[in-house]
Amino acid sequence: MRTFLKLTLISTALLLTACSTISKEPVKHIDMYVKPYYDARDGRLEQINVNKDIDALLLKNTQKDFESAVNIIEKKVDFVSPMTMFALSARAYDFGLRDEAVKWFYRGQNRLITALYVLDLDKLTVSNNTAFGQLVGQHVNPYAFCDLNKQHKAAQDAIDWAKNHPYQTVFLPQLPSKHPDRKQALKE
């Protein structure tokens, strides 16, 4: 029941975001500035600081290098941050890969929800991650919700992915947790 309620709340929030951000002009790329993590203008990434393994590739601003970055991340997803996933979503959107953008955005959202539920993070970390997610989401969600069946499948795929690839960062003892048993918290 809790999972159903959480999914319903998340879906409602995503739908409200999508409906409130629909533009008359089609958006071709995501221009945003999230200091000091991400700066993109006119579909070109100017600065990025989300994952040292792929930042340089993403800065090359080519689809081929984006795909190489995705391959690197997919080989070690267990510790990949929500912010990295949001950056992949934004870059996919910039290259016209809308379904890929939705996939990475939803994965990032689920990973962020997991981290926020289990970890006792400082306010700045929470703010930075949620702001990044909201900025990307206001572009990705209108596309995702154009086809509700496709959106539902993408959301479910992301939930399944999150269950099959638990965010290992939540188990690091140096990060404070809201729960004495982190594994049990993930099951809730």
Describe each model-derived feature in a short phrase.
Residues 22-79, 111, 115, 125-188:
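N-terminal alpha-helical interaction modules that lie
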Residues 98-114:
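TPR/TPR-like (Sel1-like) alpha-helical repeat modules
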Residues 61, 93-94:
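Hydrophobic/aromatic side-chain positions at a characteristic register within alpha-helices
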Residues 16-18:
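C-terminal motif of bacterial Sec signal peptides marking the signal peptidase cleavage site
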Residues 2-10:
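Sec-dependent signal peptide recognition
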